[in-house]
Amino acid sequence: MDRIAITGGAQLNGIIPVSGAKNSAIKLMAASLLTDQPLRLTNMPRLADTKFLGKLLTRLGAQVDEREGLDGSETVLHAAEITSGFAPYDLVRQMRASFNVLGPLIARTGQAKVSLPGGCTIGARPVDLHLQALEALGAKIDLHEGYVYAQAPRGLKGAEITFPFVSVGATEHAMLAAVLADGVTHIHNAACEPELLDLQICLNAMGAKVEGAGTPTITITGVAKLHGATHSVIPDRIEMGTYAVAAAMAGGEVQLTRARPELIDSLLVKLEEAGAGVVRTEDGVIIKRDGTRLNAVDVETQPYPGFATDLQAQFMALMTTAKGESRIRETIFENRFMHAPELMRLGADISVSGGEAIVRGVDRLEGAEVMATDLRASVSLVIAGLVARGETTVSRIYHLDRGFERLEEKLGACGAQVRRIKGDAEGGPDHD
């Protein structure tokens, strides 16, 4: 398996262009199943996860054409005919979000057989809410031997859907299914993440009638048919936040371009509170820090627009060398401090109890061999390695390749001493 080696001590100075959002791109790709006309997605990230979903869409009958356009990478998806409604375990297990093809398949063809996603390394993330939403829309759902058998021979019907708790994936899934339902659907207690607004913009460009994405109530008036469209994927706020933290950690001055800093306001406020310089620009944000040591600050993960759980691991890495004691509370997912023991291998002083971690800043981290446990944890180890004395080697970096496009290249262009060490072919475990 490949590894990444980081030699600590170099400041970061330069420009990093932010890629399109992975968490938006994979749902937009699933939306291509809703029409028999081409959907052209620009500002597309080139990641392992988008490749996994492309393979699944191809299995279902879609044509997936990746190309380079004037605005960077783009993907054209054309599901002129759904030749199969079967999404097998060997593909769905590779990425949980691929389960979201279920709704579009039912909406367009009236039937589907989709594997349950399987296990997840970040605690319990059941798909019960997804299935309940589809049942509310009139789908008949049966579970048998690890597969979801879904039917709606007379089509889906508009419905009132109220989620008992906020779920980004379930909200997106309900939107994808309801756009072709007969009648009006109201989604209550909907997730408010910006990726949902991005999905709404794309669906409406395809002829859907969706209102309210980004608020707790989404209204969808079903239409009989969708058409093709061109849509630019929203910038990746998690990648943006990750490089912002990396710049604050290593010191120097990094300009993030093709970015929307308002999407990570909750993080930028904490960086300023810790003592980093934050300058918002027309095209993004500049993060800078001189040799002054950062101050410890507390964070608590919350649904958007609160502090993102997907930035918690990165921020913990930042706090390992801050002055004082930081309390980090994780309220979104259980078992999401698996990066803490690996950071401790680098010399971090961290205590974990339930959903809270206490980070006591140390003067210096020491390079060591560490292992990535999931996507965000893996990049937190790279961030810590930027300041650790000596060399830090991160293994199991297939996690990184799922969510960060050209990470070594982007950091290296700013002066980081980071390189990929090629290994044997990677299988990798099931992905979340």
From Swiss-Prot:
Catalytic residues identified in the record: C120
Name of this chain's protein: UDP-N-acetylglucosamine 1-carboxyvinyltransferase
Catalyses which reaction(s): phosphoenolpyruvate + UDP-N-acetyl-alpha-D-glucosamine = UDP-N-acetyl-3-O-(1-carboxyvinyl)-alpha-D-glucosamine + phosphate
Gene Ontology BP terms: cell division; cell wall organization; peptidoglycan biosynthetic process; regulation of cell shape; UDP-N-acetylgalactosamine biosynthetic process
Main location per the UniProt record: cytoplasm
GO terms for MF: UDP-N-acetylglucosamine 1-carboxyvinyltransferase activity
Family indicated by similarity: Belongs to the EPSP synthase family. MurA subfamily.
HAMAP family in alphabetical order: MurA (MF_00111)
